[in-house]
Design a protein with these regions (language model features):
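Active-site and NAD+-binding cores of ADP-ribose-processing enzymes
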Residues: 1-206
């Protein structure tokens, strides 16, 4: 997935935060700013290098604030662009690139949906999101054909994540977060990254 680099070592006029330097300007890279770092915190939604990961939400709507009352299971779902693309069919689809602030993720097994009970359990245990190795979305037709030829398509639910990763090395994680303020747009954001404002674009303090 495309992610924006955020670590910049050395003394900068923007000041230091946690041993890393952050610019006060979002003109070049918003993930370098102090505002972003305050909002992002110790989020675990990062790439293999530990940098903030851009993930995607597929929809046919124009969303400025996510609304939990409009979800089937109470969670907001994100993944790779290929995964998000598979969640929406037909014309007018919109793939929204975002960053997620989730520092306490519950690792769960993908059984092809029915996340409502798992979301409630994760919330009850104090988690702020769920991460899972996606077994059903974002796989190419070539991978599906290979799995079918190997007789594995009917065995996906029974596989452990380790077994699935071995069978499908290109598989990627997906994420579910519970609160609108955990989501900020990766494009068109004014740079405030206000943790109290659910608007994903402007995030202006009120």
């Amino acid at each position: 997935l495309p992610a924006r680099g955020w670590v910049e070592r050395g003394q900068k006029s923007g000041g230091m935060f946690g041993g890393l330097a952050f610019s006060r300007s979002a003109s070049n890279d918003p993930t370098l700013t102090e505002n972003f770092r305050r909002w992002f915190g110790d989020s675990k939604v990062v790439d293999s290098a530990g940098k903030p990961l851009v993930v995607y939400h597929g929809t046919k709507s124009v969303i400025t604030e996510f609304d939990g009352s409009k979800t089937a299971d109470g969670g907001f779902h994100f993944g790779t662009s290929a995964q998000a693309n598979m969640r929406v069919s037909g014309e007018g689809k919109n793939l929204m690139p975002v960053y997620l602030s989730a520092s306490s993720l519950q690792r769960s097994k993908d059984l092809g949906g029915n996340w409502k009970a798992k979301i409630k359990a994760a919330q009850a245990s104090g988690k702020d999101g769920i991460v899972y190795l996606n077994r059903y979305e974002g796989l190419s037709s070539e991978v599906i054909s290979r799995l079918s030829g190997e007789g594995l398509l009917d065995k996906l639910d029974r596989m452990s994540d380790t077994e699935f990763r071995r069978a499908v090395p290109e598989a990627e994680d997906s994420y579910i977060v519970f609160h609108p303020t955990q989501i900020k747009s990766a494009i068109g954001n004014n740079g405030n990254f206000d943790p109290a404002n659910p608007d994903i674009r402007f995030s202006r303090r009120k």
